Amino acid sequence: MGIQGLAKLLGDIAPSGIKENEIKNYFGRKIAIDASMSIYQFLIAVRSDGSQLTNEAGETTSHLMGLFYRTIRMVENGIKPVYVFDGKPPQLKSGELAKRTERREEAQKALSKAEEAGDTENIDKFSRRLVRVTKEHNEECKQLLKLMGIPYVEAPCEAEAQCAALVKSGKVYATGTEDMDALTFGTTVMLRHLTFSEAKKMPIKEFHLQNVLSEAGLSQDEFIDLCILLGCDYCDSIKGIGPKRSVDLIRQHRSIDKILENIDTSKHPPPENWLYKEARELFKNPEVRNPEEIELKWEEPNEEALVTFMCQEKGFSEDRIRSGIKKLTKARHGSTQGRLDSFFKVLPSPANKRKLQDGKGSQNKKAKTGGKFKRPK
């Protein structure tokens, strides 16, 4: 779920912290991608008849096709992706997971009714709600990434938290996910829609945490409390207090603790045994692997092993897979020059940066940043 309504709220209270960008402008960037979120997107991208892509054995292969081609597209645009997989969910998430199970059961009942009625629109709608990423999906995707030469990280807990840790340590430039709680975990740059299909024509939404906090007039601790008030995966929120009221309360009282001392709890009762302090601590100090102990290596794809896995085992067309591998190999060799601005330690002013870009020819055209924000790591 992430944080309820946060993207829209930030568009209202901190628009300078958000910009739209094109994938080509991330040339030379290392980006940590929330693997489960991406795999989920690939799985719900069902075909026009409402079914997922399967092989002759009836095994779902949508996730493998999506991962293969979207990863190639990123590498063709000079991006160095690293996928981060979820580990064991925190105990605080058990309530949210139970709610998701209930919603799936309701969706299953609704799907059965839609199938009886021949209601194709609702069949599609409720089929999507039943999709979930399994351990098998994850393991197959890890195998594919390894054969493609793309690094991945297994987080001990939440993938978004591990992505944020990689960004904060300077190992990567940004977190790629649809879940807004990557910002709550402290990622300095977050990209939405990065792994969407080109057919959707959705620009990449780029969030810069420091600009968001500055324009919203909040510290990171206050922002975390705001996210808990809006609704997160780890505890309930106060009923009857919407996004605008939540912002006003945080700006006035600066913490949930002070809000509880000052609001009329008879009108807005907090949840019983409210675990907001535990949720706050989880956002501030999540369980992650030490980024300094993580080595990220992008290597040559193993063509024959890829063909064996994707074609002989999973039933994909050999011509198409070999064509994809050629694109991947060519793109890898074309993106080794890196970003021009990665050679500079001092951050130039926006005006100086434009002068540098105007004077460096085609190499710099590839390396342009398209924005006024901080240089990459």
From Swiss-Prot:
Report if keyword Nucleotide-binding is assigned: no
List the residue ranges of the region (Disordered): 337-377
In what way is this protein post-translationally modified?
Phosphorylated. Phosphorylation upon DNA damage induces relocalization to the nuclear plasma.
What InterPro entries does this protein's entry cite?
A: 5-3_exonuclease_C_sf, Flap_endonuc, HhH2, PIN-like_dom_sf, XPG-I_dom, XPG/Rad2, XPG_CS, XPG_DNA_repair_N
Sites where the protein binds Mg(2+) 1: D34, D86, E158, E160
* Pfam hit, one: XPG_I
Chain intervals for the UniProt region annotation (I-domain): 122-253
Q: Where is the composition biased (Basic residues)?
A: 363-377
Positions of DNA binding? R47, R70, E158, G231, D233
> What cofactors does this protein use?
Mg(2+)
Is Nucleus set as a keyword in this record? yes
Task: Tell me a Gene Ontology molecular-function term this record carries.
Answer: 5'-3' exonuclease activity
Identify the stretch(es) annotated as N-domain.
1-104
Q: Which residues bind Mg(2+) 2?
A: D179, D181, D233
Q: Which domain of life is it from?
A: Eukaryota
Its GO CC terms are: mitochondrion; nucleolus; nucleoplasm; nucleus
Q: How is the cofactor bound?
A: Binds 2 magnesium ions per subunit. They probably participate in the reaction catalyzed by the enzyme. May bind an additional third magnesium ion after substrate binding.
Q: What is its EC number?
A: 3.1.-.-
Record's keyword terms, sorted = DNA damage, DNA repair, DNA replication, Endonuclease, Exonuclease, Hydrolase, Magnesium, Metal-binding, Mitochondrion, Nuclease, Nucleus, Phosphoprotein
UniProt xrefs under Gene3D superfamilies:
5' to 3' exonuclease, C-terminal subdomain (1.10.150.20), 5'-nuclease (3.40.50.1010)
Q: Where in the cell is it found?
A: Nucleus, Nucleolus; Nucleus, Nucleoplasm; Mitochondrion
Which HAMAP family does this chain map to? Fen
Question: Can you state the subunit structure given in the record?
Answer: Interacts with PCNA. Three molecules of FEN1 bind to one PCNA trimer with each molecule binding to one PCNA monomer. PCNA stimulates the nuclease activity without altering cleavage specificity.
Job of this protein: Structure-specific nuclease with 5'-flap endonuclease and 5'-3' exonuclease activities involved in DNA replication and repair. During DNA replication, cleaves the 5'-overhanging flap structure that is generated by displacement synthesis when DNA polymerase encounters the 5'-end of a downstream Okazaki fragment. It enters the flap from the 5'-end and then tracks to cleave the flap base, leaving a nick for ligation. Also involved in the long patch base excision repair (LP-BER) pathway, by cleaving within the apurinic/apyrimidinic (AP) site-terminated flap.
Instruction: Name the family.
Output: Belongs to the XPG/RAD2 endonuclease family. FEN1 subfamily.
Write the protein's name: Flap endonuclease 1
What is the originating organism of this protein?
Nematostella vectensis (Starlet sea anemone)
